């Protein structure tokens, strides 16, 4: 893979004209076929004509060292954006983020659209996982994807009026009329939830027998949240299924347009509510790219330490609940004892437990307290023995292996087609962990390994990779404990928010800055930035657009759970209902991460 650690600082504005893919595109389509946008995303951003979209996408997919994964796809309302110098005229735009694993490089394609012609060809013919992303973009922006197999709402109820991420759509409850749920409206909403197989291209039966359609969820305990799957069954065999999401949708991306850069940090904790500080990492790193902030080494190590603590915390819950889904109850109670020790440590450091909101733009909220090292030492002495007991008592159990090995299995090709990341991707033999492939927050300075599977990702392999990931996280924590740098816990930068307290008590200028940044929020330079990280469940990323304001113009959150749930039908067809329960337990998802 290409060494990304030797590049310029992440916050440099670059057009990436030196990236080989730009030359390959120009050789194929001509030197004037595209507009290349300079950003702080760290990714080549290329505006293309709508008519070229499918041809360019197909070209990139067939290159030597191809762009094999559609990582993200979404839209933007450009109508109120003032800083668009050098960009094609657009009322709306759609972007396509592609990844080449072999190159360890990305490219972002953008298509400009006029308000009176919001049509673009579907990308599902090239990448099947474009399905949900296009549905969501239509749902929230009203952009139509011609040729889409079933373009319907996915986040909002089917009866919803309007497209919430448009700039002319209200962002506050006080801008709406008071909500009333009449009997007639309740009946309408219930009718809208009725599943009609024909709408999904499903048959109600064959010549000899009828299929049964079964609702699993949205309140089934094995659905792991407000999640509904409609199963088309031939006896116990799953002929097909339709995942139904959106019940946990909170409008997190819309909130990003009404909160200051600083005050949005608590919202990031709640995107994937088990990840804690892991969720804060991509957001603050993306904002720091916009601001041009380089944080001290101590900040990097503290952030890594908190992230790995939350990774262990999340993995323990995942492993124990998976074992519970298969039928063994005891490990989940042991795991909560271990997780309690992590929460005690996190609370001692941050003051909070599940949702610390502790990372800051330019640093962390405060320095490590006295005694943090003793608490971490006690945990590191405790956890390895417990992990070994889980493996011996439950994960090596013959019954558990028989229930999970070979279930919901897929290979590398399928994983890449569906945008699978994290342990699900690495189980197929693809060695791609962002902490190693594209180090951030100083991960390149840590000695740890990436567990990789043998070529097939099944339920058992995914779980066992997470067990090994726990051990690697313990290795990282040991290094944090032994090599914590001295130095400040905030960067000395005008946009560090809030600025160091001692400065505000001595200088009127910094006191004014503190007042403005806390009351109105810091003003970030107009630009775009992007940051992906290896979160607890796969790759999580924030793509931020600043228009030179105290708030984000567009906050795009790409979560791993969303992509993983879209893959369910492809992985489970032909299996039994009982296998689906095991598969759901092996995915590692929470619905807040899916629905945002």
Swiss-Prot record:
GO cellular component: NADH dehydrogenase complex; plasma membrane
Matching SUPFAM superfamilies: HydB/Nqo4-like, Nqo5-like
Spans annotated as NADH dehydrogenase I subunit D: 210-596
Region entry NADH dehydrogenase I subunit C, spans: 1-186
Listed InterPro entries: NADH_DH_suC (IPR010218), NADH_DH_suCD (IPR023062), NADH_Q_OxRdtase_suD (IPR001135), NADH_quin_OxRdtase_su_C/D-like (IPR037232), NADH_UbQ_OxRdtase_30kDa_su (IPR001268), NADH_UbQ_OxRdtase_49kDa_CS (IPR014029), NADH_UbQ_OxRdtase_CS (IPR020396), NDH1_su_D/H (IPR022885)
Membrane as UniProt keyword: yes
EC top class, as a word: translocase
Molecular-function GO terms, alphabetical: NAD binding; NADH dehydrogenase (ubiquinone) activity; NADH:ubiquinone reductase (non-electrogenic) activity; quinone binding
Substrates-to-products reaction catalysed: a quinone + NADH + 5 H(+)(in) = a quinol + NAD(+) + 4 H(+)(out)
Chief subcellular location: membrane
Pfam family, one: Complex1_49kDa
Protein location: Cell inner membrane
Topology in membrane: Peripheral membrane protein
Disulfide bond sites: none
Keywords: Cell inner membrane, Cell membrane, Membrane, Multifunctional enzyme, NAD, Quinone, Translocase, Transport, Ubiquinone
PROSITE patterns in the cross-refs: COMPLEX1_30K (PS00542), COMPLEX1_49K (PS00535)
Protein origin, superkingdom: Bacteria
Record's keyword annotation contains Cytoplasm: no
EC number per UniProt: 7.1.1.-
Family: In the N-terminal section; belongs to the complex I 30 kDa subunit family. In the C-terminal section; belongs to the complex I 49 kDa subunit family.
Oligomer status and interactors: NDH-1 is composed of 13 different subunits. Subunits NuoB, CD, E, F, and G constitute the peripheral sector of the complex.
Known role: NDH-1 shuttles electrons from NADH, via FMN and iron-sulfur (Fe-S) centers, to quinones in the respiratory chain. The immediate electron acceptor for the enzyme in this species is believed to be ubiquinone. Couples the redox reaction to proton translocation (for every two electrons transferred, four hydrogen ions are translocated across the cytoplasmic membrane), and thus conserves the redox energy in a proton gradient.
Protein name: NADH-quinone oxidoreductase subunit C/D
């Amino acid at each position: 893979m290409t060494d990304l650690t030797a590049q310029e600082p992440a916050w440099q504005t670059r057009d990436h004209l030196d990236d080989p893919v730009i030359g390959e595109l120009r050789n194929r389509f001509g030197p004037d076929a595209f507009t290349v946008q300079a950003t702080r995303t760290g990714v080549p951003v290329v505006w293309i004509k709508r008519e070229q979209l499918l041809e360019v996408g197909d070209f990139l997919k067939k290159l030597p060292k191809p762009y094999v994964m559609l990582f993200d796809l979404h839209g933007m309302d450009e109508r109120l954006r003032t800083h668009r110098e050098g960009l094609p005229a657009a009322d709306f735009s759609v972007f396509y983020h592609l990844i080449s694993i072999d190159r360890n490089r990305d490219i972002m394609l953008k298509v400009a659209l006029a308000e009176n012609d919001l049509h673009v060809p579907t990308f599902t013919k090239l990448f099947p996982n474009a399905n949900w992303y296009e549905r969501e973009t239509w749902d929230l922006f009203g952009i139509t994807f011609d040729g889409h197999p079933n373009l319907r709402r996915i986040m909002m109820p089917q009866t919803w009026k309007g497209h919430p991420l448009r700039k002319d759509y209200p962002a506050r409850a006080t801008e709406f009329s008071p909500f009333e749920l009449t009997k007639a409206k309740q009946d309408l909403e219930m009718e809208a939830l009725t599943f009609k197989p024909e709408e999904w291209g499903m048959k109600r039966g064959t010549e000899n027998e009828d299929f049964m359609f079964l609702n699993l969820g949205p309140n089934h305990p094995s659905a792991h949240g407000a999640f509904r799957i409609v199963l088309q069954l031939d006896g116990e065999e799953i002929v097909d299924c339709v995942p139904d999401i959106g019940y946990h949708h909170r409008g997190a991306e819309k909130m990003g347009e009404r909160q200051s850069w600083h005050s949005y940090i608590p919202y990031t904790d709640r995107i994937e509510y088990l990840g804690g500080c892991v969720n804060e990492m991509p957001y603050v790193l993306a904002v720091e790219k916009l601001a041009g902030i380089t944080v001290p080494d101590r900040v990097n190590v503290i952030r890594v330490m908190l992230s790995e603590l939350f990774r262990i915390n999340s993995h323990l819950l995942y492993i124990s609940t998976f074992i519970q889904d298969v039928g063994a109850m005891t490990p989940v109670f042991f795991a909560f004892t271990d997780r309690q020790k992590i929460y005690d440590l996190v609370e001692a450091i941050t003051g909070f437990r599940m949702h610390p909101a502790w990372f800051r733009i330019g640093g962390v909220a405060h320095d490590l307290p006295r005694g943090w090292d003793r608490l971490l030492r006690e945990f590191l002495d405790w956890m390895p023995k417990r992990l070994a007991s889980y493996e011996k008592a439950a994960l090596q159990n013959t019954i558990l292996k028989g229930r999970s090995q070979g279930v919901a299995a897929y290979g590398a090709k399928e994983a890449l087609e569906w945008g699978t990341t994290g342990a699900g991707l690495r189980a197929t033999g693809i060695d791609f962990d962002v902490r190693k492939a594209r180090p951030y927050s100083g991960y390149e300075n840590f000695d740890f390994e990436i567990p990789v599977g043998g070529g097939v990702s099944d339920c058992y392999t995914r779980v066992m990779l997470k067990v090994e990931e726990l051990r690697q996280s313990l290795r990282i924590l040991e290094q944090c404990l032994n090599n914590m740098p001295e130095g400040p816990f905030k960067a000395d930068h005008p946009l560090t928010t809030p600025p160091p307290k001692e400065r505000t008590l001595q200088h009127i200028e910094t006191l004014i800055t503190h007042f403005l940044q806390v009351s109105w929020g810091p003003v970030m330079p107009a630009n775009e930035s992007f940051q992906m990280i290896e979160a607890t469940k796969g790759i999580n990323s924030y793509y931020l657009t600043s228009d030179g304001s105290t708030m984000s113009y567009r906050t795009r959150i790409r979560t791993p759970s969303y992509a993983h749930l879209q893959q369910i039908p492809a992985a489970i067809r032909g299996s039994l209902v009982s296998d689906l329960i095991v598969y759901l337990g092996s995915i590692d998802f929470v619905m807040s991460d899916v629905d945002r």
